[in-house]
């Protein structure tokens, strides 16, 4: 680091130490509304920017984590004050007007420093305390176990083994310590292959298909240049092919555009030469690099920030950004790999340049298409843990956790999350989780509130002792899993089992703009009630009705049994009664079977002359009600299906429901397309 940069950093730090604790008479502008700006106080804490409105009836608060701040733009001073525009990584946009220029400058300098910490220990997760004890924190990190995930796939087996060749990260410092490799791949072959691969990221297993032995492996690009070759690397690919007895070849998928891969040859890198590798089929996909993706997202967000654009302007801007074309390219790669594994029974090796961006996207999309387990709540967490966190996706560099090179920032995992959402739109019953689940994961990738997405590798996280010092996001999401359930999810084989097969005709798969993600803070663009919440309420009401129907059917069955017993008694010859008694089958009694069967003649009247032996078969109405709680229910149940939202536990007057304080219009939620 240069002395000039250090001096600048020192000045920023000193200014930040003297940051204003609060600034009064600040106005928060709603850029998408004509409403008057809200007047309030702006607070700067060690972790958040907080705006509190002055209105005594609402006192609405807006909280923003410093780690969520992407850019801060100081605009020209006007008669109303100094304008500050804060753009966030979760696509929130705030415009505040500060009366005094000096205060605005102080806030600007402070936020620049607070939004770009220089050490991991300054991040929010190291001070975040959800009031859980040590044992609860440890249990949170144990929620997911990758060794169990590989066992679920059927590993180890005759073809694949768990290798400790990377113990203590001695071969590749961005790989996990435990990796599955073909049994035919010796330590010598693995070491030789690693030396011939960029960043020493040799081919390792990502996903295994138990029923046909096909696999998805991942690596980085080979250091082939124009003519270099490596015997061990060639043997490694042969070992992957032999681990699948059902196929005599493997696909090698390079996710880069061919022109980019060829340009890498000049730097001594490149791609596999089919003349040197036997029994491989090579395929280029054409996903652009991180710089193109960063610029594409920026262009799309500029369109989202337009005030009242015409439909043609919005669509033109969206098309010009190229964002959905990039999403389609990632999806096409995942579809190609899934078809190769499912339909051809062939194994696939996937790589890009270094094997931690496009490779992670493509492997995880393909796995999601192939395996319904990854379309469940816990399965999706495992997928991210396996293909992103464990295999060394550079979270710190890609999402700007610390102050660093802005050219390294790129929305790589954001694109994967959007691919999942696009699939959910096409297969609404195939995913156990809902849109809110995806949005919350995206939010916490940038929030640094939990320790899961820190650092660039497993090695760095262990050196920082992340699990001992922070909390796991997965435990938080699992605890609140009821909020993330998809009400349309069905355990139907046609929807949830096996491979998701997308339409082959391009016109049958429509890629949509995800307003729920990119416009989620623009309240005027969202329905007054979440579609998911509305459907969940309908599902709960339906479940209550089904339970009530089942209870009524059970009651009816019991009453019909009593009716049948009475009929049997009637058919027997009358005997003198040893003891006098009252009729136990009085047609005038309340709650008689006639109320349900509509047949008054089917229940005989009894006289005191009938014997005890026969009367033992008959229950009095009082005994019937006291012996079976289902039969002694309130009269509102006897009439059929009561109003489930207005049942008082005490049986008294209808108590107000939980939703009684909500807007009446919420029952008429407007279903909008995403």
Write out the residue ranges for each language-model feature.
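Cys-dependent protein tyrosine phosphatase-like superfamily
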Residues: 2-348, 364-674
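Hydrophobic anchor at the beta1->P-loop junction of P-loop NTPases
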Residues: 350-352
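Ser/Thr-glycine-rich phosphate-binding loops at phosphate-binding pockets of nucleotides
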Residues: 354-360
């Amino acid at each position: 680091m240069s002395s000039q940069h250090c001096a600048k950093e020192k000045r920023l730090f000193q200014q930040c130490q003297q940051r204003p604790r609060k600034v009064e008479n600040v106005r928060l502008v709603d850029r998408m509304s004509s409403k008057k700006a809200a007047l309030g106080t702006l607070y700067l804490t060690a972790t958040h920017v907080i705006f509190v409105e002055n209105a005594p009836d609402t006192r609405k608060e807006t909280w923003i984590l410093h780690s969520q701040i992407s850019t801060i733009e100081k605009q020209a001073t006007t008669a109303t004050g100094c304008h500050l525009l804060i753009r966030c990584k979760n696509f929130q946009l705030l415009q505040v007007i500060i009366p005094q220029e000096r205060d605005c400058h102080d806030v600007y300098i402070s936020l620049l420093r607070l939004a770009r910490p220089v050490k991991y220990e300054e991040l929010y997760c190291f001070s975040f305390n959800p009031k859980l004890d040590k044992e609860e924190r440890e249990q949170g990190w144990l929620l997911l176990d990758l060794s169990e995930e590989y066992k679920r796939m059927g590993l180890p087996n005759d073809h694949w083994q768990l290798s400790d060749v990377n113990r203590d990260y001695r071969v590749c410092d961005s790989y996990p310590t435990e990796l599955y490799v073909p049994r035919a791949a010796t330590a010598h072959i693995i070491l030789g292959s690693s030396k011939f691969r960029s960043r020493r990221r040799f081919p390792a297993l990502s996903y295994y298909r138990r029923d046909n032995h096909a696999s998805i492996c991942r690596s980085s690009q080979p250091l082939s240049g124009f003519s270099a070759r490596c015997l061990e690397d060639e043997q490694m690919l042969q070992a992957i092919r032999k681990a699948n007895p059902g196929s005599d070849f493997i696909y090698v998928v390079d996710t880069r555009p061919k022109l980019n891969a060829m340009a890498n040859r000049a730097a001594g890198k490149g791609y596999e030469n089919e003349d040197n590798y036997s029994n491989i089929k090579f395929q280029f996909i054409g996903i652009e690099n991180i710089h193109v993706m960063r610029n594409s997202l920026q262009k799309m967000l500029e369109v989202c920030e337009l005030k009242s654009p015409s439909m043609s302007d919005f669509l033109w801007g969206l098309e010009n950004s190229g964002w959905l074309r990039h999403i389609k390219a990632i999806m096409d790669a995942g579809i190609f790999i899934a078809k190769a594994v499912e339909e051809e029974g062939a194994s696939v090796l996937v790589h890009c340049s270094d094997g931690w961006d496009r490779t992670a996207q493509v492997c995880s999309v393909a796995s999601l298409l192939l395996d319904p387990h990854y379309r469940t709540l816990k399965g999706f967490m495992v997928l991210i843990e396996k293909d992103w966190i464990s295999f060394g996706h550079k979270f710190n560099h890609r999402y700007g956790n610390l102050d660093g090179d802005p050219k390294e920032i790129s929305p790589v995992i954001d694109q994967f999350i959007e691919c999942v959402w696009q699939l959910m739109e096409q297969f609404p019953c195939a995913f156990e989780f809902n849109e809110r689940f995806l949005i919350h994961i995206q939010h916490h990738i940038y929030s640094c509130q939990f320790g899961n997405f820190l650092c660039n590798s497993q090695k760095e996280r262990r050196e920082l002792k992340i699990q001992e010092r922070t909390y796991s996001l997965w435990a938080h999401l699992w605890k609140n899993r009821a909020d993330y359930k998809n009400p349309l999810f069905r355990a139907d084989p046609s929807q949830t089992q096996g491979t998701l097969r997308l339409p082959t005709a391009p016109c049958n798969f429509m890629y949509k703009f995800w307003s729920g993600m990119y416009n989620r803070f623009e309240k005027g663009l969202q329905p007054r009630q979440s579609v998911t919440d509305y459907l969940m309420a309908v599902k709960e009401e339906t479940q209550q009705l089904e339970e009530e129907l089942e209870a009524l059917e059970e009651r009816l069955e019991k009453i019909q049994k009593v009716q049948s017993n009475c009929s049997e008694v009637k058919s027997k010859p009358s005997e003198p009664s040893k003891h006098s008694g009252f009729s136990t089958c009085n047609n005038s009694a309340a709650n008689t079977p006639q109320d349900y069967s509509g047949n008054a003649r089917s229940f005989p009247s009894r006289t005191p002359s009938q014997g005890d032996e026969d009367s033992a078969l008959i229950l009095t109405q009082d005994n019937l009600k006291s012996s079976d709680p289902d039969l002694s229910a309130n009269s509102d149940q006897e009439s059929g299906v009561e109003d489930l939202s207005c049942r008082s536990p005490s049986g008294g007057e209808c108590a107000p429901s939980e939703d009684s304080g909500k807007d009446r219009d919420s029952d008429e939620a407007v279903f909008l397309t995403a």
